[in-house]
């Protein structure tokens, strides 16, 4: 009689930044602390976090915050990285700090770094999670996270109630999860101000990766590319030849780091007890209100 295989437990890795940004621009600025500082992003995030915890009763969990909004290793590598974005308002930065404190007070492990982005911290945990025991559920709407998906993992855009598995990524992006970093390096990523290779769009990048697999594979077969049935293939070949170093540098931007320092091993990233004093301090100073504080305290327990 064969042994039953225990079902994989969910390990939730949450990108908090997107929910804070969404709340900042969608919640009314009538929410404020005692000094009149806006708390709309914090309120929106707190309500979302309540709903998420009540829905999942998550135990193995970590929440990542973007502390390195303009100071990550990518900015040092390529100063134009995300330079097309307006700086985060100071009022929002203050609320990021509150949201980190709130999350930690709820006993939830917090990830943040001045050198690595939230995506890198999530990637570093996912890389070290024991896949014999866990499947990772990435709670985010960030397309870059799709490159991390293993067979049993789920990318969950919670706010829009959409989920993606590794098998669905190719129909969504035209490439496999493992090729997303190469694809974005070639085709560019306007959201992060990465131009890609001049004249190589999404369709051409997909075709090249379908044929050769990786950026390395493309350059290993560079002399053969002129034989592919692609429009302006000779021009594309010449562009690739002259852009080699730049494209490999771009891939360092689009590929998530898996070696970021973590506060603990994944096995220790579990929800602990509520820090009552810490929770009271955050909810009191930010005027979140007693009703929301009670709901937060009991969420998912």
Stretches found by the model and what they are:
Residues 2-136, 145-162, 248-249, 255-263, ...:
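Noncatalytic, basic helical substrate-engagement surface that gates or grips nucleic-acid strands
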Residues 6-8, 58-59, 152, 165-301:
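Non-catalytic nucleic-acid-binding/docking modules located in mid-to-C-terminal regions
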